[in-house]
Amino acid sequence: MNLIYLTMRFSLNEKNYFCYMRNIFLILLLPIYSISQSLYNPQLLYDNPGGIFDEDSLRSIYLDFYNPNYHNYLINSWYYNPSERIPAILTLNGNQLDSVAVRYKGNSTFCLPNDVQNVKVPYNIDMNYYIDDQQLLGYNKIKLANAWMDPTFLKQIISSNIYRKYLPTGESNLVKLYAQGNYVGLYVNDESIN
């Protein structure tokens, strides 16, 4: 018994004692730390998707215009008064926003598809143009690009992910767009940078 006491007395000098106590403390914290950790579960991405720019979910945006002749009106507005917007009801995941302001955007991405009478033109949607402080999942404005000449629909999303590693960059993802209840097509949803 005295031999064990002497061995501990000589081996536990002040420096060793500190290391010994630190290790005991860390061992005692290990169960607490382990309980607080969560395992990665990819199913959570589908059960609880993130914000409006979540790349792991394909959302559907429904635009219901008050003007049934909205397409021709927006085309004329694009040529004669490009900043003019018309009101519509936007629905996303059951959330409905009344009186969002919609206009067509783009130049070549607007003109070229429109030359072949394609209704898949790019959109600029402003949530708080008519109603102050109205937001869609925390955003005031979104831009829906038609990915003209990009059959993969990935150019904007991949470049955004690369740029984001080095620069402050807007987010992008894909959405399905319906106008007046009719499927218009797959769009690239770009964050509007003010």
Where are the language model's segments positioned?
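Short, low-complexity, intrinsically disordered N-terminal modules
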Residues: 9-10, 32
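Short hydrophobic targeting helices and cationic amphipathic motifs
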Residues: 3-6, 12
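Positively charged n-region of N-terminal signal peptides that target proteins for export
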Residues: 15, 21-23
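Selective for proline/serine-rich intrinsically disordered segments
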Residues: 1-4, 29
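Sec-dependent N-terminal signal peptides
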Residues: 23-32
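Phosphate/dinucleotide-binding and metal-coordinating scaffold of catalytic cores
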Residues: 37-194
